[in-house]
Amino acid sequence: MAWRTTLVKTQLLNTEWRQRQNRRTLVFRDHFRSNRNKFTLALWTLFSLTAIPGSLPPSISVEIKAQANPNDRVTERRDMVVRQIRRRDVTNPLVLSAMETVPRHRFVPNDASLQSRAYADTPLPIDQGQTISQPYIVAYMTEALQLPPNARVLEIGTGSGYQAAVLAEIATEVYSIEIVPELATTSRELLNELGYDNVHVRMGDGYGGWPEEAPFDGVIVTAAPDHIPPALIEQLAEGARLVIPVGETYQAITIVTKQAAGSSSEVTLPVRFVPMTGEAER
C-alpha cells in the first residue's frame, strides 16, 4: 500500500507542476504579446547597428515597415546613412545621427519625380533656380567643421533649410543668411514647423557674415564664391573652421582654420555648387 500512496503523491505533484508551468506559459505569452512591438523594435535597432545592409530577416523587415508611418521614410534615411555616407568615411556619430534624423524629403519640392529621389545621393533643384546639396556633401562639410560642444554656427546660403536643420541637430544655435527673399521666408517657416527653434534665418548678403552674433565656432558656406570673403574668417572664434566651396568653373571645398597667428587653409574635395551672389556682383 505504501508504493500506491507514493504513486498517488507523485501523480499529484506532477499535476501541480504542469499547472504551474501552464500558468507561467500563459503569463509569458501574454507578456510577450503585449511587448511584441517593443521587442521587434529593439531587435531591429540591434540589427541596424551591426548587420550588413539587406541582411535582415524578411519577416522582421516587413513587420517594421507595416508599423512605421509611411510619411516618415525612416528606413530610407537609415539606408542613406549606411550606403551613401558611412561607407564614404564620414564617421562622426553626431553627424550620422543628424543625417538619419532630419527628414530630407520635407526640404525637397512636393513633386513626385523629385520626392522619389529625396534620399538619393544627388543634388536636387528647389525654388528660385537653387539646389539642395547631395546628402554626402552635407555630411562631409558638417563633419569638416569639427564643432565643439554647445557650438554656435554661421551658415551662408540657407536655401531649402536642409543644411541648417542638420547643423541644428548638433549645434546649440545656428545663424543662417539667405540672399533670396522667397527662400529665406519658406525655409524659416519650414524650420519653425519642424521644431528647429534654435535656427535663426535672416535675409541678407552673406559676404558680410553676421557680425552682431560673432564669434562663431564654425562657418559653413553652401554656395561658391570666387574668393574667400575676409569677413567670414574674421568672425570665426580662435581655433574654429570655415568650410567653403571656392572657384568659378572648377570648385573645391576649402577648410580654413583660424589661429592666433593668422589662419591656415586646406583644399580637400572637388565639388560643384551654385555661384554665391551678393557683394561680388557689385
Set out the residue ranges of the language-model regions.
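Compositionally biased, intrinsically disordered low-complexity segments enriched
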Residues: 13, 21-23, 33, 69, ...
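Bacterial N-terminal signal peptides that target proteins for export
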Residues: 20-45
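Bacterial N-terminal signal peptides
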Residues: 40-57
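Conserved nucleotide-cofactor-binding alpha/beta core module
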Residues: 146-264
